[in-house]
Amino acid sequence: MGASASVPERSVHQFTVKDSSGKDLNMSIYQGKVLLIVNVASKCGFTETNYTQLTELYRKYKDQDFEILAFPCNQFLYQEPGTSQEAHEFACERFKAEYPVFQKVRVNGQNAAPIYKFLKASKPTFLGSRIKWNFTKFLVGKDGLVIDRYGTMVTPLSIEKDIKKALEDA
């Protein structure tokens, strides 16, 4: 879903995504905010570190126009096997996530969510645009453009300086 069939999206604000209960959410509500968009999974070896640090970052910067947007994904060894609602409950109950956890998406392939097609095209890696694993992170500026992309091994707290810089930029 996006702006129109003939006009390619130019920012994340032009997309519509679904929340964990399946309701449409227009991403334009995030205009003027710095976003960290992450594909998450509850049964991954990187789950504990990432969710813990995402919650810490969110608590620290949520009052400074910062949002974390978590998109559960079951494409990597089926490590998010439950429903979207179960993924939401897992994040909120176990890790006290106060940020949005959306409907499960595909991040790679023909049926990848349109927002993920945009994110990957905006910041491909030297190995191509394909997302390699859970907890790939995209830092998005207040203008809705992708600032940077971080792989699984990059912890949320290690990109705090980039988040601060994005928050300071007009």
Swiss-Prot record:
User: Which GO MF terms does the UniProt record name?
Assistant: glutathione peroxidase activity
Keyword entries, A-Z: Oxidoreductase, Peroxidase
EC numbers, comma separated:
1.11.1.9
Name the residues annotated as catalytic in the UniProt entry: 44
Query: What domain of life does the UniProt record list for this protein's source?
Result: Eukaryota
Substrates-to-products reaction catalysed: 2 glutathione + H2O2 = glutathione disulfide + 2 H2O
* Gene Ontology biological-process entries: response to oxidative stress
Q: What does this protein do?
A: May constitute a glutathione peroxidase-like protective system against oxidative stresses.
Its name, as the record gives it, is Probable glutathione peroxidase 4
Q: Can you name the source organism? A: Arabidopsis thaliana
